[in-house]
Amino acid sequence: MLKFIGRHRPSFLAVLLVANLTVLVLPVVGTYVLYRLYEGTHLVRSTEGDLIAQGAILSAAYTTSFSRILASESDRRAYGVPVNEKWRQVRDPETEPFRPIKPRLNKLRDDVYLPAPNSTTGYEPDPIAIQVGRDIQPALIEAKVVTLTGIRIVDFNGTVVATSGTQLGESIANREDVQQALEGRYTSLLRQRVTDSTPTQLGQLGRRGRVRVFVNLPIILDDRVLGVVVLSRTPPKGFEAIKELPR
């Protein structure tokens, strides 16, 4: 047995070669793991955070326009649908003035859903929501040029009343995440991105990853859901984001 081991003992050169290869491979593997974590967690959550910020501003703009159009306080209190008891937040504005929403998506952990189902037709938007939508529609279109964010604002029935693109007057209430948001719950998820064989220049800039981040922010006033801001954007690829880091 000892003779067999002696005859098959690796040479010093072979041991040195294996050790050097290990030293070379470990940094590569470590760098790859860090890259995957950066792309799958940081960039996705950064995108979600940006969408939350945009959605909060649009939600505030919507409620401001809504309060101006529907001036009667009693009418406002009867408008929309009540927030589901499960999602109602009991807080004292004096002791808890802020209500932050933290990004939570993780491409390495969360499911990636199929592209959003097609919108449906045949639904009549709420008349008040139509007026509010007309007020803020130009802002949505201008924002998309800079942020590359797809934006839809739906009324309390899930019908699109303002959009940065298409589907105006159509319903997206067939999406489960939108249904939950219409109950007053913030929802976010990852979907497979839809590719286009003949994308525009803007589309080429926007479709740089394998997934698209979707955020659904309820528009709530006096514990009643007026509608939902639906936003989506493709996070940048890791290498592109790294190139933009300050040197």
Where are these regions (language model features)?
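Short N-terminal helix-loop-first-beta-strand/juxtamembrane motif that initiates sensory/input modules
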Residues: 57, 64-65, 71-116, 131, ...
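Short, Lys/Arg-rich, polar N-terminal cytosolic tail immediately upstream
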Residues: 1-8
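Helix-start (N-cap) segments at beta->loop->alpha junctions
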Residues: 195-196, 220-222, 230-246
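A short, hydrophobic, proline-anchored segment that marks a local hinge/packing element in signaling
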Residues: 193, 205, 214-223
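Extreme N-terminal signal-anchor transmembrane helix of membrane signaling/transducer proteins, especially
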Residues: 8-36
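Juxtamembrane membrane-water interface segments immediately C-terminal to a transmembrane helix
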Residues: 34-60, 69, 130, 245
